[in-house]
């Protein structure tokens, strides 16, 4: 789960991280009073969406102006006008895709005198099962370009969970960032605070870009992006309260309410599978035979007719889907239950695209019999390869 920048900064502030004072604005008429509560003489007006690249982004609507989603104002009135221009508009960045995201929140914060822009992130390194630090002296809007063209400017290391974080980790970050004097001590404390927040709040990713050195020599968190482990949210009610469902894919949101693991992709063949490994194998074989999967959808081991029906609704709500492949291995899940769910779903949604079903495992013969006697136009797949070839042929011809 992701949260907005202003929420991330409030969380980090509670852990002692140095951040600018700011105000969130939901309505245009709130902007002037919000900006007036801040000191100036420079105000930063930021669009709040769950995507990076806001500074280099562009709005679809000409009324929003030609600048990106991060703008500078030199007066309260100008800050209010910039907020008014961006609220309700659609911001397109390299992370949103061409459809962009609607800006429903604006964050106005005090400007900072910047001497240097740095990069600092904490990530879960799944290869080592440790928390890793990733740091660079080249922070700011071009960090992706730095990673691609000059990777030697990025330093990373992990923390052994058995021994935990120590001061030397903070000093290692400081030296990698080229900090000196009192800045090293500040960095050591900041690293401690960020690491504690990361662990206590079950984060998956914490990105500070940029971490700035101000002209007075002090450090400040200028932007923050935080992602949390969805599997740990049950023990983080305060984090769950920060969830903004308007920022989530509607199909993924609907799937989560039925405990379906769904991720939208860009292809034309919808997939419904039980088990993450089998789902990935199904997507691979669709690509092998010349097509592209439209989604990852794992119905899990305890799917009911209701869950299967909802899964079909979610898949068919994607206008790019030109065919559907159902691939079920019945272990915990019985194939006859899945078959009943498929029939009910096809009847309820009025399926208009080809459907190939491959069943194997517990009660597979009952499942096949239910589908065969349904009177519906469902194509049976004898095995995974056969099913994949049939759905690709049905879609591509």
UniProtKB/Swiss-Prot annotation:
List cellular component terms (GO).
cytosol; succinate-CoA ligase complex
User: Transmembrane segments in this chain: where?
Assistant: none
Top-level division of the source organism's lineage: Bacteria
Q: According to its UniProt record, which cofactors does this protein need? A: Mg(2+)
Q: Which residues form the ATP-grasp domain?
A: 9-254
Presence of keyword Magnesium: yes
Q: Subunit structure of this entry?
A: Heterotetramer of two alpha and two beta subunits.
Extract the HAMAP family matched here. Answer: Succ_CoA_beta
The identity of this protein, by name, is: Succinate--CoA ligase [ADP-forming] subunit beta
């Amino acid at each position: 789960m992701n949260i907005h920048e202003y929420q991330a900064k409030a969380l980090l502030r509670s852990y002692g991280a140095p951040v600018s004072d700011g105000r969130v604005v939901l309505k245009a008429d709130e902007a002037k009073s919000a900006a007036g509560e801040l000191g100036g003489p420079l105000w930063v007006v930021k669009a709040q969406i769950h995507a990076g690249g806001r500074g280099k982004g562009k709005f679809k609507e000409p009324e929003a102006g030609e600048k990106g989603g991060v703008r500078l104002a030199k007066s309260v009135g100008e800050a209010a006008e910039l907020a008014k221009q961006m609220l309700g508009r659609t911001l397109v960045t390299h992370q949103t895709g061409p459809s962009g995201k609607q800006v429903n929140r604006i964050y106005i914060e005090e400007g900072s005198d910047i001497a240097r822009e740095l990069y600092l992130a904490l990530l879960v390194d799944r290869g080592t099962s440790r928390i890793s630090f990733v740091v660079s002296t080249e922070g700011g809007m071009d960090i992706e370009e730095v990673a691609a063209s000059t990777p030697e400017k990025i330093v990373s290391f992990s923390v052994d969970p058995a021994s935990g974080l120590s001061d030397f980790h903070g000093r290692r970050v400081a030296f990698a960032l080229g900090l000196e004097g009192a800045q090293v001590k500040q960095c050591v404390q900041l690293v401690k605070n960020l690491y504690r927040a990361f662990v206590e709040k079950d984060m998956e990713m914490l990105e500070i870009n940029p971490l700035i050195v101000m002209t007075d020599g002090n450090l400040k968190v200028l932007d923050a992006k935080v992602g949390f482990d969805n599997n740990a949210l049950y023990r983080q009610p305060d984090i769950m309260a920060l969830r903004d469902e308007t920022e989530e894919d509607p199909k993924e949101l609907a799937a989560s309410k039925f405990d379906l693991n769904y991720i939208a992709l860009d292809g034309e063949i919808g997939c419904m599978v039980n088990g993450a490994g089998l789902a990935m194998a199904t997507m691979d074989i669709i690509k092998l035979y010349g097509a592209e999967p439209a989604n990852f959808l794992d119905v899990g081991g305890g799917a009911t007719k209701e869950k299967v029906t909802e899964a079909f609704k979610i898949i068919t709500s994607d206008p790019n889907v030109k065919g559907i492949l159902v691939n079920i291995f019945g272990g915990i899940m019985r194939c006859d239950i899945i078959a009943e769910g498929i029939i009910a779903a096809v009847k309820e949604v009025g399926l208009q695209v080809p459907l190939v079903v491959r069943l194997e495992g517990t009660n597979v013969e009952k499942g096949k019999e239910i589908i065969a006697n349904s009177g519906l136009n469902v194509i049976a797949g004898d095995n995974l390869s056969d099913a994949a070839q049939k759905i690709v042929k049905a879609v591509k011809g």
